[in-house]
């Protein structure tokens, strides 16, 4: 890959009403005629099986595709209230600068200003290029594949916006500084997702280099948790590829089995999750949304889950179950081929790229970033890690009209 060698950098200030903010598409949708409130979170309800992602707060179910946009906002509000913490308002001002391989983003809100950076690697050939944001700046989708497909790589050290402070759960980083204590109940996964959204703003400000309509996000392990949150909470992300994300990422909380990281451990290890999650630690079945519902926030866009069945701590069987349940959402929206899960790999090394993943990742890139014909994304689990969805739910996907 190459770096930008222009003699002068680009500096643009984005007035966010002109640059589509995160979730903008959903915000333009009117509430259904039945009067459902699209900003209302689902209430806690104890249940051992996976919650119905089509169930509204009033007890009715989504009946049409046009109602899904409102339901997505309900699920989003529920995920904020019970899992991640509040995302907060969109910033008043974003400035983005690219100088060589350095991206600098400056964000202003309420008289305060913060700055963070990322590293850009461009593929050979003329732009504008699709872009893959790598949360954490390590691992992620194979470099050789990105180069071959003409995709730029943006390495993002997400701890700049949300620091990992261990068991103290102290909130530090640009996201928390910008909001001056108002978001201290929010977890760092949401802060990382916010940082990815600001990089999408930066991409939108440099359309001669990068394509704002062809942005992907990836990351492995804890960064995979952040990649999923980024894709779930920003509809401008065309393709999300969480890798070996473990508890707090793809796997369903209710289904984490023996050897997998328990919810209380994930909550206490780092301030990844919002403080609202603590209310469910004694009874995880009281969560009104599980991670299949978070995956559903990505629908009908591209989502490819890459998993590792050789490390019990990652909870691959619960990840496969979560993907199967989420696939019902894509199916109801008529977009089955846009969701994939691949966990059938021979190598158990954590965060190593596997040859088995190259073909589905290539198809995902071609399908969702390049607009090319490509195979539907697979749903493939390793023997011994495959889930049977039937006993894990008491709902069926509706036939949305």
Residue ranges and their predicted role:
Residues 8-19:
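Bacterial N-terminal signal peptides
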Residues 26-117, 122-127, 148, 235, ...:
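Alpha/beta-hydrolase-fold serine-hydrolase catalytic core, especially in secreted/extracellular enzymes
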Residues 129-131:
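Alpha/beta-hydrolase fold active-site loops
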Residues 134-212, 246-255:
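Cap/lid segment of the alpha/beta-hydrolase catalytic domain
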Residues 191, 195-199, 217-220, 242, ...:
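Extended catalytic-interface subdomain
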């Amino acid at each position: 890959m190459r770096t930008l060698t222009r003699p002068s950098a680009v500096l643009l200030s984005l007035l966010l009403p002109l640059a589509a903010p995160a979730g903008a598409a959903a915000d333009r949708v009117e509430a259904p005629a039945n009067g459902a409130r699209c900003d209302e979170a689902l209430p806690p309800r104890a249940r051992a099986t996976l919650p119905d992602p089509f169930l509204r707060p009033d007890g009715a179910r989504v009946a049409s595709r046009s109602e899904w946009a409102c339901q997505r906002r309900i699920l989003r509000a529920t995920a904020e209230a019970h899992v991640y913490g509040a995302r907060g308002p969109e910033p008043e001002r974003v400035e983005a600068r690219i100088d060589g391989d350095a991206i600098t983003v400056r964000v202003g809100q309420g008289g305060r200003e913060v700055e963070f950076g990322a590293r850009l690697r461009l593929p050979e050939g003329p732009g504008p290029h699709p872009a893959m944001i790598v949360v954490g700046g390590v691992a992620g989708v194979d470099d050789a594949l990105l180069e071959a497909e003409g995709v730029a790589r943006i390495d993002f050290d997400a701890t700049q916006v949300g620091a990992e402070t261990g068991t103290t759960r102290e909130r530090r980083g640009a996201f928390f500084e910008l909001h001056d204590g108002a978001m201290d109940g929010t977890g760092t996964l949401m802060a990382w997702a916010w940082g990815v959204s600001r990089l999408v703003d930066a991409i939108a400000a440099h359309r001669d280099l990068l394509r704002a309509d062809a942005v992907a996000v990836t990351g492995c392990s804890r960064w995979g948790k952040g990649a999923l949150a980024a894709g779930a909470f920003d509809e401008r992300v065309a393709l999300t590829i969480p890798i070996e994300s473990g508890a707090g990422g793809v796997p369903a909380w209710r289904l984490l089995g023996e050897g997998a990281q328990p919810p209380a451990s994930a909550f206490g290890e780092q301030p990844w999750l919002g403080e609202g999650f603590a209310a469910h630690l004694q009874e995880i079945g009281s969560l009104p949304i599980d991670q299949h519902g978070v995956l559903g926030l990505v629908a009908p866009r591209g989502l490819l889950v890459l998993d590792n069945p050789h490390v019990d701590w990652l909870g691959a069987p619960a990840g496969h179950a979560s993907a199967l349940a989420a696939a019902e959402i894509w199916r109801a929206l008529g977009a089955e081929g846009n969701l994939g899960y691949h966990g059938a790999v021979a190598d158990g090394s954590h965060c190593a790229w596997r040859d088995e993943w190259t073909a589905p990742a290539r198809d995902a890139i071609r399908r969702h970033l390049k607009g090319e014909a490509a195979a539907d994304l697979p749903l493939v689990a390793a023997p011994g890690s495959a889930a049977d969805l039937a006993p894990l739910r008491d709902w069926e996907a509706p036939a949305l009209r």
